[in-house]
């Protein structure tokens, strides 16, 4: 089961998609508890420095815990919004992109090296993002899928 914690832009979007995101977690990992935590730019920068040795804010950090809560996905809506503008994307689609990315990291996928695992990760990410994005747009328009484009 996915829990959406913290505060920030996108929380309601993620809550509305929690069932669909939970389906992806179950498919990729199993029936586990996962937290998606929205944090500020300062918080994620500090976490990135502490855990990765990188002194800049990032959009998503994933931490497997393998306990009652299987893992936590930290998302910084401010960086997501900046990335959306940079990549000519909507905030909503970029948010879906990073949460799916985090789920796949929890499932054991990695992209640090250009290998089969990275290729498979990004292929799955693309499929899941389109699936979730289309479902979200459809929910906005009463089932026609025409809103939010």
Curated annotation (Swiss-Prot):
Its cofactor is Zn(2+). GO terms for cellular component: cytoplasm. Binds 1 zinc ion. InterPro entries: MetalPrtase_cat_dom_sf_prd, YbeY, YbeY_CS. SUPFAM superfamilies: Metalloproteases ('zincins'), catalytic domain (SSF55486). One of its GO terms (molecular function) is RNA endonuclease activity. Transmembrane segments: none annotated. It comes from the Bacteria. NCBIfam families: rRNA maturation RNase YbeY (TIGR00043). This is Endoribonuclease YbeY. It comes from Thermotoga neapolitana (strain ATCC 49049 / DSM 4359 / NBRC 107923 / NS-E). The lineage of its organism: Bacteria, Thermotogati, Thermotogota, Thermotogae, Thermotogales.
């Amino acid at each position: 089961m996915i829990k959406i914690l913290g505060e920030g832009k996108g929380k309601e979007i993620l809550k509305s998609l929690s069932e669909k995101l939970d389906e992806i977690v179950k498919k990729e990992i199993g029936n586990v508890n996962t937290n998606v935590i929205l944090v500020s730019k300062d918080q994620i920068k500090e976490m990135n420095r502490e855990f990765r040795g990188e002194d800049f804010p990032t959009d998503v950090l994933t931490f497997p815990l393998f306990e009652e809560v299987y893992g936590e996905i930290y998302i910084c809506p401010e960086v997501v919004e900046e990335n959306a503008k940079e990549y000519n994307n909507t905030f909503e689609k970029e948010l879906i992109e990073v949460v799916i990315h985090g789920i796949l990291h929890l499932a054991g996928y990695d992209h640090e090296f250009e290998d089969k695992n990275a290729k498979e990760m990004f292929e799955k990410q693309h499929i899941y993002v389109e699936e979730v994005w289309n479902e979200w747009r459809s929910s906005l328009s009463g089932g026609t899928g025409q809103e939010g484009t």
